[in-house]
Amino acid sequence: MTATYERLRHSTDSAALSEFARRPLPDRSDQAAFSRATALLEAVAGNAHTPVGDRVFLAETMPFPNILVKLSTDESPEVRKAVAGNADDKNWLVGRLTKDESPEVRATALRNKRTSWKMRLEGAEDSTMDSDTLDFLGSLGTQVEPDAPVVLATMVRRAVALNPNVSDRMLQQLAQDASSDVQKAAQRQLAEK
C-alpha cells in the first residue's frame, strides 16, 4: 500500500486522480479494503494535481478526519470552504477554519453546526465579519438552532449587536430580543447611529 500511496501522492495524472477520487468506496464490512481505500484517498486529496472539482467533492462528501484535515489546508479557498461546510467535521477542525484567511471560508465555518460556541462568539466579535454572517449569528437561538443553549446563544447575539458591521435590519431585530442584555446592546447601538 505504501508504494500506491506514494504513487498517488506524487502523480501528475489528473484524469487518474479524478477517477480515483470519484470511485465508490468498498463496503465497510470489508474492513481491510475499506481502510486501504480511505488511506489512498488521503493521498489523492493532498495532491494538487487532483482537479479542484474532485477535491471539493471529497471535501463535501467524506466523513473521514484524515481526508478532511488534508483538504482543510488546500491552496484553493473553494476546497477549504467545502470542508468548512461538511457536517462531519470535528469541531476543532471547523473551528480552525473560522480563522481561515478567506472570508468565505470563515463565514461557512461559522454556519456549521459543529462550530463551537467559543468560535461563534469570536466570529460575532470580529469587526471584519460580513453582515450576512452576522445576520446568521444574530439569529442563533431564535430562528436558527432554536434549541441552542440559551446563555451561549444570547452571548453571541449580544456580540452581534455590538459589532460595527451588523445590518440595520438585524440591529432592529436584536433591539426586540427576548434577552434584556441583547436588547440594551442593540438599542445603544441604534441610539449611536
What would you call each of these model-derived segments?
Residues M1-K193:
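Alpha-helical scaffold segments
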